[in-house]
Every structure is written in C-alpha cells, then in structure tokens.
C-alpha cells in the first residue's frame, strides 16, 4: 500500500488568482463602510443643527415671554 505523501510547500500555498479576486471585495467593503459612516455623520450633523436651532428658538421665546411678564 502506498502511504499518502506529505503535502509539499507548493500544494499548501493559496492559489494566486484567488488572492487577487479577494482583494477588491475587501477594498469595496471598506469603501462602502466609509460611505455609510460619512452619510451617517452628515445626517447626524443636520439633525443636531436642527435640534440646536429649535432649542435656541425656544429659549428666545421663553426669554421674550419673561421680559413681557416682568415689564
């Protein structure tokens, strides 16, 4: 009976085309994650600005009402 041969260094290496095919996917995933983060940051900044503007408007109304009540 023939014994199974030990895997040589050549047979254990990953095929080169597979590595090249794998890399663009990782790059695309990284760029899409970055795109999502940028969109999220823009959305949050607009939402925060709107919230701050509303709070400032409310504060101005409270101050004006207090001034009218005190005079």
Swiss-Prot record:
One of its GO terms (cellular component) is membrane. Its main location: host cell. It is found in: Host cell inner membrane; Host cell outer membrane. It holds the Pfam family Phage_MS2_lysis. The keyword Transferase does not apply. Residues 1-24 are annotated as: Disordered. It is a single-pass membrane protein. The chain crosses the membrane at residues 34-56. The keyword Transmembrane helix applies. It comes from the Viruses. Induces the formation of specific membrane adhesion sites between the inner and outer membranes, apparently leading to host cell lysis. Lysis may be performed via activation of host murein hydrolases. This is Lysis protein. It comes from Enterobacteria phage fr.
